[in-house]
Swiss-Prot record:
GO terms for cellular component: photosystem I; plasma membrane-derived thylakoid membrane. Keywords: Membrane, Photosynthesis, Photosystem I, Thylakoid, Transmembrane, Transmembrane helix. Its main location: membrane. This is Photosystem I reaction center subunit VIII. The gene is psaI. Pfam families: PSI_8. It is a single-pass membrane protein. The keyword Signal does not apply. The chain crosses the membrane at residues 12-32. Belongs to the PsaI family. It is found in: Cellular thylakoid membrane.
Amino acid sequence: MTGSYAASFLPWIMIPVTCWLFPVVVMGLLFIYIESDAPST
């Protein structure tokens, strides 16, 4: 893999984003959805 294309930095920056940031965002949105959808008894 050579850095001859325009967005050569993209795979390097997408690895921590997809491994760390994406699960945190998904878990946060899922937590907000579950807590807002919970019946208030």
